[in-house]
Amino acid sequence: MAVENNTQRSYSIIPCFIFVELVIMAGTVLLAYYFECTDTFQVHIQGFFCQDGDLMKPYPGTEEESFISPLVLYCVLAATPTAIIFIGEISMYFIKSTRESLIAEEKMILTGDCCYLSPLLRRIVRFIGVFAFGLFATDIFVNAGQVVTGHLTPYFLTVCQPNYTSTDCRAHHQFINNGNICTGDLEVIEKARRSFPSKHAALSIYSALYATMYITSTIKTKSSRLAKPVLCLGDLCTAFLTGLNRVSEYRNHCSDVIAGFILGTAVALFLGMCVVHNFKGTQGSASKPKPEDPRGVPLMAFPRIESPLETLSAQNHSASMTEVT
């Protein structure tokens, strides 16, 4: 009987997942692919001063030569929250004290007449799926900002190698709008025009903050008071150091890293609070009692005082009834 009370029939959850959510996810991944791997979106050509000291830092090499390479970054920021959510959900499901509250918040879904979707499977797919969507969405926002602004990296003039003997560069305070003045490698120059906001900073803080919100909202540890702070602060510190590494290697300006942190934080907070509702179950809000309508409540209640006339009338009525009987 308890299983029947905790079961909800739904014929739309699987079609909605296949034809709506998977389509949106595929479109997001496809758009991120076009930003990353194709020349569909051309970078804005931003002008510069030939003697700008902020753009004359030494060339740090390719991204693969960085202390935090893109491959290592993407693997860590994708695997860490996924592993935390997977291990956390399985642990809570098999621990008796947390399993009861989990079942109370999340109902078993019956699709058709034979297929059951357990609360464990639904929560894992929901939380990891939203995280993956936010990861690609953050990447799209970053690439869009870099393409639109065309902000120059600190080493731009080093790889641009402008012709300083030309008429345009002879004047120290002349602003150069001509992109053809550069004589360096065109591929490296194009990458040097994509600095704002910092992709490493945005993705790292998004991943760290999403994992931190999950840990603080779902994992309950009464025996240890320092386990959760260590995990959360460790993730946030790693993201912070990733941004500092971009500045120390002259790959981004401080403003680029700060903008990346703000962007990643905004996406993580929006998804964590407004989409997955602080990682609570779908039945969590339904169990709260509805507030009483204030229109039906009197502004002030006074005690009722019985009138002497009413008392005398009641006594006479009872006496008359006695005489009749």
Curated annotation (Swiss-Prot):
Highly expressed in the brain. Also found in the liver, kidney and testis. In the brain shows a strongest expression in the hippocampus and cerebellum. Belongs to the PA-phosphatase related phosphoesterase family. Its main location: membrane. May play a role in neurite outgrowth and neurogenesis. Keywords: Cell membrane, Cell projection, Glycoprotein, Membrane, Phosphoprotein, Transmembrane, Transmembrane helix. Pfam families: PAP2. The keyword Nucleus does not apply. This is Phospholipid phosphatase-related protein type 1. GO terms for biological process: nervous system development; phospholipid metabolic process; signal transduction. The keyword Membrane applies. The modification Phosphoserine is found at S307. It is a multi-pass membrane protein. GO terms for molecular function: phosphatidate phosphatase activity. SUPFAM superfamilies: Acid phosphatase/Vanadium-dependent haloperoxidase. The chain crosses the membrane at residues 13-33, 67-87, 127-147, 201-219, 226-244, 257-277. SMART domains: acidPPc (SM00014). One of its GO terms (cellular component) is neuron projection. Glycans are attached at N5, N163, N316. Induction: Shows a transient down-regulation due to overexcitation of neurons induced by kainic acid. It is found in: Cell membrane; Cell projection, Neuron projection. It comes from the Eukaryota.
